[in-house]
Amino acid sequence: MSNGKSWAGPWRGNLRRPINQAVDSTDFVARLLSVCEVDPESVATAPVVLAIDTPLAFSSAFIELLVQGRAVTSIEGSASNPYLFRHTERFLFERGISPLSAVKDMIGSQATKGIHVLARFAPHIEACGIWSDLGRLRAIEAYPSACKKSSTMATLQREYPEIGALEHADQRDALTCALLAWLFHYRPGDLAQPGPEAPLREGWIFVPADALP
């Protein structure tokens, strides 16, 4: 998606081969574009934002428990459990949105794949929730389900009537992620941003600000 125009065709499949075969971030982006039937050379100099629908980090408390054997003082309810949920996820819980946990829910495999992609192709933390290759690629975490009440997202989606023809919910979520990436690049003020209290390495789930009460 560039300047609000969708260039890529819908695609749903396993990215294991592009991830394993890519030699660097430029090659990885080119392989992603190719599976979506976009000529990589046509956008060779364009900035790239990947909005990835999976947890891109584990909580600091969980990492400290595993690596250092350091426990938190107490564990209360599930939604406030710092081992299960990061600051960004607890932020959403407090606002009526229920994200999944990379630890207790069935998304751990996808989370490790997303973290693996960051480590290989966008290993530098530019700011909380923003990973980059120090070049044209930046990656952020998206959560399409959190966008359902956003009038900003609804307005953008109406510009793509083909969304109703997409065969699978994953493809519709992919379009929502692409629109989130567009907002991040062109209209970051429309997204809820992390505060100074957000742990840098835990990342941040970017959602439209008007999706939150």
How should each PLM-predicted stretch be described?
Residues 1-213:
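RNase H-like (RuvC/DEDD) metal-dependent nuclease/polynucleotide-processing core
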